């Protein structure tokens, strides 16, 4: 499948800002299951590119002059491959063990531990696709998709206790459960063809390391839709949680109020 992607992020400030810096994960990863056919980033200031610790294509946008808004636009076309059972084709140098570490957003709580124990094998840190799909189904039923119920600072434990959240919360609950059993699992940010789900085009899901009879490696799962990843997905970045894989994340100096508008349009071509 080929996906045409247009993603605009617009920040507006009530007073002029003296300085702002934004870390961007807005370029699709170079992986066997997806290929960039064209891609362009438009920013208002100096934007330097680099590869981060997880192998994500990253950019650092810096604005040193007074500004009342920041507009970031990415456009391009990506060719994706239909995967068998959500199995990634990627061969990586990163040790899976770095994705067994809990973060502030994925710290275990008694409720999370109970969920993990109910769905995952009691002994050892190896799981099958069936095991993690069982966990996915339980999270799908326990945490309703409710826009505005949480924010980017909400933890996995808070979302599970509330019983509501969005895609990043579903991902964090899944990661917290896996990490409590020392199972490698990681956060994925990216895009999805909304025609395949009916939800927003900017999305988050998870990769988890499985050991099936005929496969040992990463399987990609969309917890919010209780399904395996297909060719309707474009992968931007991986990380331990939202904070390490967010499409746009930064800070500013200047005070006042901030509003943000995000518009992502993904169309199969």
Task: Give the residues covered by each predicted segment.
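Generic structural "secondary-structure junction" signal
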Residues: 19, 26, 43, 56, ...
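Residues in well-ordered beta-strands of folded domains
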Residues: 25-27, 42-44, 75, 207, ...
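Short helix/loop capping segments that flank catalytic or ligand/cofactor-binding pockets
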Residues: 82-85, 245-247
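"Short basic amphipathic alpha-helical interaction patches in structured regions
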Residues: 86-93
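Secondary-structure boundary elements
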Residues: 78-80, 94-165, 173, 242, ...
